Amino acid sequence: MAKPRVHEIAAEIGVDSKTALAKLKEMGEFVKGPSSSIEPPVARKLKAALEAAGLTGQAAAPAAAPSSAPRPGARSSAPKPGGRPTPGPQPTAAPEVEAPEASDVPVPAKPLTVAERQAQAEASRKAAAEEKAQAEKSAASATPDAPAAETPSAPRPDAGSAPAPSNGIPRPGIPRPAAPRPGNNPFASNQGMGTKPRPGNNPFASNQGMGQRPAAGAAGPRPAAPRPGSPRPGAPRPGGVGQGARPAGFGQRPAGAGRPGGAPGGAGRPGAPAAGGFQRPAGGFAGRPGGGGRGRGPGGGTAGAFGRGGGKSKSRKSKRTKRAEFELREAPSLGGVSVPRGDGNTIVRLRRGASISDFADKIDASPGNLVTVLFHLGEMATATESLDEATFEVLGTELGYKIQVVSPEDEDRELLEGFDIDLDQELEDEDDDVLEIRPPVVTVMGHVDHGKTRLLDAIRNANVIEGEAGGITQHIGAYQVWAPHEGYERAITFIDTPGHEAFTAMRARGAQVTDIAILVVAADDGIMPQTVEALNHAQAANVPIVVAVNKVDKEGANPAKVRQQLTEYGLVAEEYGGDVMFVDVSALTGKGVEDLLEAVLLTADAGLDLRSNPNKDARGVAIEARLDKGRGAVATVLIQSGTLRVGDAIVAGTAYGRVRAMMDENGDAVHEAYPSRPVQVQGLSSVPGAGDTFLVTEEDRTARQIAEKREAVERNAQLAKARKRISLEDFTRALEEGKVESLNLIIKGDVSGAVEALEESLMKIEVDDSVQLRIIHRGVGAVTESDVNLATIDNAIIIGFNVRPDPKARARAAREGVDIRFYSVIYSALEEIESSLTGMLKPEFEEVQSGVAEIREVFRSSKFGNIAGVIVRSGTITRNAKARVIRDGVVVGDSLAIESLRRFKDDVSEVRTDFEAGIGLGKFNDIQIGDEIETIEMKEKPRV
């Protein structure tokens, strides 16, 4: 859909474009001008903000009021100047004599009463309707009607001569000093344009879409005005003192034969109700009932009578433009460039992964100048490179802007609003009569190995734990079971989350989609770190908690201790006067399972309103997703509202498609899935991320467009996240010392949640600043040949989590020497990767003393310099070893080398303790008897 422009929105609401631009700036949305286009969500926010501020319709009202005000005013005051001496018989050569009279006449004008103003407004509306009808007629047929319309003004002697120039062409032959030549007036109707000027040539005409201009000053230049500064006698001044209500248009001065230089004729009276669009007796343009004074109003001065146009001078700039240019000149420049600066509180909203070009568009600056500024701030980036929030904070602080990076939730909400999809509004608009009761969604949480999956096995009468590697849940499982309650079979949806510390994100996701949380605590272990974390997730999601004290049949079990420990975290058992239900269970024997289900249903009925609308398109969450070799992308989704049917067009995160098939947790086909029902969906184009929202759209095209936009947003966010910030100092140091060692990884897993958990855990490994971990690709499914090619180019290691490579990938990896490692337990992968990073560290060396020799004699040689005769006191002195000379405990020579080592006349490689030798230290000759020569070795220090 086409994006709306600012001036279109302003016209629709009825405000001025400047007001709309100012409101956009307050909202943090900076656009260049009224013709700039904005996103539909921003347009809706702008309309809401203007309506909330009460600004709608303020631009249209001032435009309409002045347009009608001059006519009634001129009409009511028309009889007053009628008593003046008739100016018709005056000589043609003396038009200036009337100027003093005209300036003196407006004095007796008196203010209008409220009744008169209302009558004038009614008359102006009638006149406007008649003007529209008369504008459709030709000038020849319109002129004879003018005298009849001006019967109230019959006493004016020039009324009878008004029809003379009805053809609208002023005669050049008449000696009128102030009348321009026909070719001098570009706005006159006698320029070969027939009876009416062409709309496109007249920027002041009423049909130019400029209705917001005050009509009182729109007449502009007047071709037959001999007195440029004379106001209309007796006419009101709607624009204040500076804008006189001059007779409307060029046609107000017919310049007939009987009026060589006289006042306006009766046919063009601005206040006449039947003037009908102003007959243009002197070649004016229609529909503009009033002109501004000399340079005092929107209509301009009388300069237009001499062919220069009556508009505002082009060389003059508005105060706003001058102020902006002055601020730009006075703004301090960084790096020799000038950029617009904020006041320190100017908010700029940017999407995740935005570039310098995006920031430049927001503040109306040049991207190249911003790149220069950023370079002088110590950051190197290109104009189109995705930057992180910290970099924008540095740049915004320097330029006086507050940077607000849109959160992923708000970004996705605005994206959907662009397709007229508002999930929150849908929920608010639902009435109680369309809501139906749905089953509760229960998440099982707790510490690792406390028996969560075993408890679910006991509830489902199945054995899930045998399918998990190492007995640790690696995925989120979703099941629906039926339990008897008060004589009825009630459905309960269970979500099993991992308890290992690596699966923090998956636990948080489980808490966000659940209604009730079952906190499983082992009676023998008590409270553990992941127990507290799961408790915090549930409390943050404002989810009621039911505590299942497991393993009560085990030796050393102490359920009372668990109750006491949880009291410290705000969970007080009912038997202690609290409101949290504690149930003692044994997943191994099945004891207390029925009591636990009853506690869940009682909690759901007591404090939760579990209702949703099943009669609409489905909305929900993708709990888990994987890539199946035979079925393609398979996503486990939980329907939160609506009904999902086979054949629906669906979009989940960056994946889209049609629902080809649905199955429950047992593999049985499902044709319709109602709220709170977990199903496995086939038919998606790719594997969605765990926790992505899904929704049903009317068309495949809409689903594809939403997915593509989400993919672009996610790609930019990943680029900004992967960018390593490097300053100029770091860059110089890297050039001198060599590049930083990095371990490149490619992660492939069976489900998206496990890949995400593994990636987050790996990125938390901190070994040393000299070694960094880079994940260049992650995905769901088997290791493919393209993964091996990518690993070959980037020297990466491929980590497969519960997946295996296909034959071609295995053969290519063997041929290229790519290391592929497979894991089924997540912490095994973490330990090995950490060991690999430790092995990549540069070795650390420490000084170790290898020997000490005392100088007994100094032999001086002209060929070899001074030779030290020594006796080895400790250790071993070796040739070419590093040495230092120590005198009275002070080092007098360092970084030396033992270049020659002899015993008597024989060269030797080493001399042991208590043996004598001769040592030559090269060019170092500052040795004395009693000095010590200490030799050292650099040995590698083992990493801890």
Curated annotation (Swiss-Prot):
Gene3D superfamilies: 1.10.10.2480, P-loop containing nucleotide triphosphate hydrolases, Translation factors, Translation initiation factor IF- 2, domain 3. InterPro entries: EF-G-like_DII, IF2_II, IF2_N, P-loop_NTPase, Small_GTP-bd, T_Tr_GTP-bd_dom, TF_IF2_bacterial-like, TIF_IF2. GTP binds at residues 446-453, 496-500, 550-553. Its main location: cytoplasm. Residues 55-329 are annotated as: Disordered. Residues 437-611 form the tr-type G domain. Residues 82-92, 223-236 have a biased composition (Pro residues). PROSITE patterns: G_TR_2. Residues 471-475 are annotated as: G2. One of its GO terms (cellular component) is cytosol. Residues 258-269, 284-310 have a biased composition (Gly residues). Residues 586-588 are annotated as: G5. Residues 311-322 have a biased composition (Basic residues). It is found in: Cytoplasm. The keyword Cytoplasm applies. One of the essential components for the initiation of protein synthesis. Protects formylmethionyl-tRNA from spontaneous hydrolysis and promotes its binding to the 30S ribosomal subunits. Also involved in the hydrolysis of GTP during the formation of the 70S ribosomal complex. This is Translation initiation factor IF-2. It comes from Clavibacter michiganensis subsp. michiganensis (strain NCPPB 382).
